[in-house]
Amino acid sequence: MTEPRFELTDDLFTPKEVSWLAFNERLLQEAEDLSVPLIDRLKFLGIYSSNLDEFFRVRVATLRRLAGLGFRSREFIRHDPKQVLDQVMREAKRQHARYNALYEQLIVELGEHGIHMIDELAYDEQQASFVEAYFHKIVRHRLHPIMIRGRGDLPPLVDQAIYLAVRLSDSRGKRKPRYALMGIPTDVLNRFVVLPSRNEEHDLTYLDDVIRYNLGSVFSLFPHDTHDAYMVKFAKDAELDLDDDIQESYFSRISRSIKRRGFGSPVRFLYDGSMPDDMLDLLLTKLKIPRDESLTPGARYHHRSDLMNFPTVGKGSLASPERPAVAHPDLPTDGNYLRAVRRPDVLLHFPYHSFDHVLTLLREAALDPKVRSIQICLYRLARNSSVVNALINALRNGKQVTVIM
């Protein structure tokens, strides 16, 4: 008896992009888990958002490129890239709705524990004075508004940055509205500002709302008396383009491709869904963004990856306690790691062991005259990476440094 033939057809396989979205949705399940401390649940939302940003910049960007190849795309992917792209956008939209509902639920739960996220309309007199002082001392000099004029295009926006699109209007209707775009400096300031609070309550506000409250000061040169602001976020194609120039080294091609990353085509434009249509049309025209599936209407606040840095306020039980990392007993406390690692293998288990061990090893290697080269594989880097600083120092000391990302 012959065994039945089993044919592997494309419909038996789930596209990896769709599978990845299901993987990332596990973070939403963690955020819904009542056994997880409340502030940790918020941080899971931040991790979800950060992962999704990178997914759109790389995987969705690649799908768009493949969709533009037509039938030739089947050389690189089993499924029709247009169909996969449609499936991805539908699933992302479904998860986006789940995410927003979960965020609102967690904000309510924070309130039940005496932690309140308030906007610029809810500041009391003491908080308003604090916000004004904080704005002028800390925030004002970091703002660089760009006026949107009738002629000319806007300069390229910074990838993954968040902006306030501002409309200046005259309540008496005597002057035409004016428009501006202004970046929110979350690269140097915490997105969350802790306000003066009473009793055992804790009031926090978004940095965005601190800026909204002070828009009259920012645009004091203009006679308009009404200021409306809507958040937008821009994600660009971050896939690497490698030229086929065999006369050039792979390193040179990678370097040039990374430099071009900031000028990629838009793959996602997230905007406040309450923005007036005429204002949205103006932005799309000036930024040369088509009205297609890359447009994503959202809520008042974007860039929720900042939730990973939500302040630990309130009772200690609302966040997991920090566990101090311990030193490895087989590594010396006075340095000379290069000699130590020549002995039996040392297993470091993070985050339980201190990452300082790795930094110490790299810093020693950067200085040791016997070290000629350093090769290292890195998966993810901090914004201000001590690892990168150590590797740069090694380069300055004449070492050859190779990093695989």
Regions found by a protein language model. Name each.
Residues 1-405:
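N-terminal localization/anchoring segments of enzymes in phospholipid and broader phosphate metabolism
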